[in-house]
A protein has these predicted regions:
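Flavin (FAD/FMN)-binding glycine-rich loop and adjacent Rossmann-like elements that form
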Residues: 212-215, 219, 260, 323, ...
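Conserved N-terminal/central alpha/beta ligand/cofactor-binding core
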Residues: 246-247, 252-332, 375, 398-405
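N-terminal secretory signal peptides that target proteins for export/translocation
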Residues: 1-38
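N-terminal Rossmann-fold NAD(P) dinucleotide-binding loop
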Residues: 234
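Bacterial N-terminal signal peptides
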Residues: 42-53
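Beta1/beta-strand and adjacent pyrophosphate-binding region of the FAD-binding site
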Residues: 219-231
Length: 639
């Protein structure tokens, strides 16, 4: 396989000693200089003062994106809020233990006075949160503590005027608590009166200018199929298409594959692959399967990250792009021509063009950006005729989990007080040493896409608050237990469902209807989550613990027509963002089932490429050939 790295170099990017900068003097002439390391982008703009013959005054802005620090120490990159921030950030995720400093080197063009601005937030202002950190320059604190302002809005905080004595300076972020302090960027400016913008549109333009991000990203190539989303569905789609001889780009916004089944989220695979109407479907899912380590296993290796990547690496037709968030779609009329992604660490942008695209993001990101019709939330009974539908349509969705686990130690340990977290009591607390699927937030009171950060933070407040209570009040049981792992990447269940040519519903599932284009065989119960009644009693409107009622079903097939967009002509879907009703979604959403959807998409994309037709054209004109592949009657071409 051709793994394409995400290099730090760009045409405009720095070499090991500095970066090319562009300055315009008062006469409009251009001068280039080499003035900083690869983590700081200088934008030098000269303001022409039209007062008599006064000379031009120079302003130098040094923007440092924290996700690009050379050594992130114990801080982690979080891209989950890219859709509302247009940026990633780093976070001190230490589970109550301060993490190692994040460190980088900055090269200033001159010594002297600079105004420091720090973009951060107080993530748990109840009344003040625990995410405190300091900015360190050459081993000395700048004198302020950030992350405890009492405001949960992302904005620039005034760090005061700093006297830079060394042109080459070591910059560090020092975590003070281990409780998820976070920082998006730092700005040094020699215009001591300048205030950076906070409004998103202006901030995005400001950021793009200083990072020299143009409208011409690096060309990442053209592919037969571009798969966006490297969860189980997307990875299986990429492998399936590659084994049919197609060139494939697989784009994933995290450093690992597997999505909810990766070590970052740790949800086990569910759904059967051995009850298939087409028994040979599911072979790739079996390759990816790591058995059943359960949910939230403290041993990361149990989720097989390395094996998943090694399987993809073995496919010479796949070009893998990790750490790449797709944020833009290019199209002509109703046909996607390319997607653009940004590296979540280096901010390098790449353009991926292709004949066909598969949205395996879970959130339906590609479809949404392309203008595909979609649905989010519950339909009404009047709309669907389903007994499980809501009386009135609403925004209710299944929630997001941040799983956690503790381990036994030889000695007693303590845990900090957490006045900013959810508060528990003898009357109500959750007496367990690790989580399972029930730890879940987002039942319509949070938007699972635009409020992903708030959902995760709400889950963290529940986890840390409950653990603090257990350590203090049940010492006999929990005294020697220690938090070993808490997920900072949310395991999302439901968001957008892209509308296809068919909408699978509750009756299709319970009546076992079989359609001519039935493809994936699904077996999971109709499993719709709702807030646990006792949790609602004590945390009404702030629930973080779920209940469910499993409705058993016989094996049924999902029509191929659910796996492509109704109004975007070259867009496939696989995973939880296919078009079903909310009720049917309760059964189709589990990962082995989603992986088989990916396999079908890979086969269908082969036929679409072969005949230069659309995903719909595969259904209308070539369904027997697709069925033959599903049955194993049609051999894959030799790559």
């Amino acid at each position: 396989m051709n793994i394409l790295p995400n290099p730090r170099r760009q045409p405009w990017a720095p070499n090991a000693r500095g970066i090319d900068t562009l300055a315009t003097d008062a006469r409009g002439s251009m001068a280039r200089g080499s003035m900083a390391r690869n983590l700081a982008i200088w934008a030098s703009t000269f303001l022409v003062i039209a007062l008599l013959s006064l000379p031009a005054m120079a302003q130098n802005h040094l923007l440092i994106e924290t996700e690009s620090f050379e050594d992130k120490g114990g801080w982690v990159i979080d891209q989950q809020s890219f859709v509302v921030m247009n940026s990633s950030y780093i976070m001190a995720h230490g589970m109550g233990r301060p993490v190692k400093d994040a460190v980088t080197t900055v090269k200033f063009p001159k010594t002297g006075k600079y105004h420091l601005w720090v973009r951060t937030k107080d993530w748990a202002p109840f009344p003040k949160g625990p995410g405190k950190f300091q900015v360190i320059l050459d081993g000395k604190s700048t004198g302020q503590t950030f992350g405890e302002s009492g405001s949960d809005a992302w904005k620039w905080y005034d760090g005061g005027v700093i006297d830079i004595k060394n042109a080459t300076t070591k910059l560090a972020l020092k975590d003070l608590t281990g409780f998820n302090g976070r920082c998006d960027a730092l700005l040094f400016t020699d215009d001591l009166k300048f205030t950076p913008p906070n409004e998103l549109e202006a901030l995005t333009a400001f950021r793009r200018k200083l990072l020299n991000l143009t409208d011409k990203p690096q060309d990442a190539g053209r592919y037969d199929l571009v798969v966006v989303g490297g969860g189980i569905a997307g990875t299986c789609a990429a492998i399936s298409a590659a084994r049919m001889g197609l060139t494939v780009a697989l784009i994933q916004d995290r450093p690992v594959l597997g999505g909810n089944n990766s070590s970052e989220v740790r949800v086990h695979l569910m759904g059967d692959v051995d009850k298939n109407h087409y028994p040979k479907l599911g072979r790739i899912v079996r390759e990816m399967d790591n058995g059943d380590p359960g949910n939230g296993n403290p041993d990361a290796k149990e989720y097989g990250d390395a094996r998943k990547i090694s399987i993809v690496k073995a496919e010479k037709n796949i070009s893998l792009f990790l750490n790449t968030h797709v944020f833009k779609v290019e199209k002509e009329n109703d046909i996607i021509t390319a997607v653009v992604g940004r590296d979540i660490a280096t901010n390098q942008e790449r353009r991926f063009s292709g004949s066909f695209f598969s949205d395996c993001t879970g959130d339906g990101t590609v479809g949404f950006l392309a203008g595909a019709d979609f649905r989010m939330g519950r339909e009404s009974k009047a709309e669907t005729g389903e007994s499980l539908a809501a009386d009135k349509s609403d925004d209710f969705t299944l929630g997001t989990s941040n799983l956690w686990a503790s381990v036994d130690r030889d000695t007693v340990s303590s845990f900090p007080e957490t006045p900013w977290a959810m508060q528990f009591s003898d009357e109500y607390h959750i007496d367990e040493p690790k989580s399972d699927w029930q730890w879940e937030t987002g039942f319509g009171n949070f938007n699972t896409i635009t409020q992903a950060e708030q959902i995760r933070d709400h889950n963290l407040r529940a986890i840390y608050g409950n653990w603090s209570y257990l350590k203090k009040n049940k010492a006999a049981k929990y005294g020697k237990k220690e938090l070993a792992w808490v997920a900072y990447i949310g395991g999302k269940r439901e968001s957008r469902r892209i509308i296809g040519d068919y909408v699978l519903n509750q009756m299709d599932i319970q009546e076992g209807k079989f359609y001519p284009d039935g493809s994936v065989t699904a077996t999971w119960t109709i499993d719709l989550h709702f807030p646990d009644a006792k949790n609602s009693k004590y945390f009404e409107g702030q629930e973080f613990f779920a209940g469910t009622k499993h409705i058993k079903v016989a094996p049924y097939t999902i029509p191929y027509r659910c796996l492509y967009s109704k109004n975007i002509q070259n867009l496939f879907m696989a995973g939880r963002n296919i078009r079903t009703t909310h009720g049917a979604f309760g059964s189709t959403r589990v990962m082995r089932t989603c992986g088989m959807m990916g396999e079908v998409v890979g086969f269908a994309s082969y036929i679409a490429n072969k005949y230069k037709t659309s995903p719909r054209g595969v259904y209308k004109d070539h369904l027997p050939e697709l069925t033959g592949i599903l049955k194993g009657e049609t051999l894959a071409p030799q790559p």
